[in-house]
């Protein structure tokens, strides 16, 4: 059972890694003016909720299965994702708003956030991989 949990977490983490890379590529395309702000934000806003759900599901599964270290490791990023989603101003189209993305350095902050998430998900990938191997050996 524990091995299945870590296999699912590993697959989910791979999806979140690819999603972080997609965010970085799309934001860098906007930064270089290869795409306009409206198409960039519409592409990115489609993936905010799946990212939120994917990360929250893994965090809850770690809590339920009593893997405290991994849960506490995932908790700040999951809380940040939920906070960011809830605190979208009422006039904005989503977390990524085409009218606001070039103001006050938001593009750079979104890019920095995507890079940090990529590093975090890579760290989690190796933790899940190690835990999966350990669970398979112990079974």
Swiss-Prot record:
Q: What is this protein called?
A: Protein cornichon homolog 4
Q: Note the SMART domains from the entry.
A: Cornichon (SM01398)
Protein's job: Involved in G protein-coupled receptors (GPCRs) trafficking from the endoplasmic reticulum to the cell surface; it promotes the exit of GPCRs from the early secretory pathway, likely through interaction with the COPII machinery.
Membrane-protein topology: Multi-pass membrane protein
Spell out the Pfam families in the cross-references.
Cornichon (PF03311)
Q: Using the UniProt record, give the first listed, main subcellular location.
A: membrane
Please state where this protein is localized.
Answer: Membrane; Endoplasmic reticulum; Endoplasmic reticulum-Golgi intermediate compartment
Q: Which GO terms describe its biological process?
A: endoplasmic reticulum to Golgi vesicle-mediated transport; protein transport
Q: Which domain of life is it from?
A: Eukaryota
Question: Mind telling me which GO cellular component terms the entry cites?
Answer: endoplasmic reticulum; endoplasmic reticulum-Golgi intermediate compartment; membrane
Which stretches are transmembrane?
Answer: 5-25, 60-80, 118-138
Which keywords has UniProt assigned to this entry? Endoplasmic reticulum, ER-Golgi transport, Membrane, Protein transport, Transmembrane, Transmembrane helix, Transport
What's this protein's family per the entry? Belongs to the cornichon family.
Matches recorded under InterPro entries? Cornichon
- Encoding gene, per UniProt annotation: cnih4
């Amino acid at each position: 059972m524990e091995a299945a949990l870590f296999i699912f977490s590993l697959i989910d983490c791979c999806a979140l890694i690819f999603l972080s890379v997609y965010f970085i590529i799309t934001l860098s395309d906007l930064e270089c003016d290869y795409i306009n702000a409206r198409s960039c934000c519409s592409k990115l806003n489609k993936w905010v909720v799946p990212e939120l759900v994917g990360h929250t599901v893994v965090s809850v599964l770690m809590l339920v299965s009593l893997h405290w270290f991994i849960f506490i490791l995932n908790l700040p990023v999951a809380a940040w994702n939920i906070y960011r989603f809830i605190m979208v101003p009422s006039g904005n189209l989503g977390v990524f708003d085409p009218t606001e993305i070039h103001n006050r350095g938001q593009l750079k902050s979104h890019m920095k956030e995507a890079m940090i998430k990529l590093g975090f998900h890579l760290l989690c990938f190796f933790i899940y991989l190690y835990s999966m191997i350990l669970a398979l050996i112990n079974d």
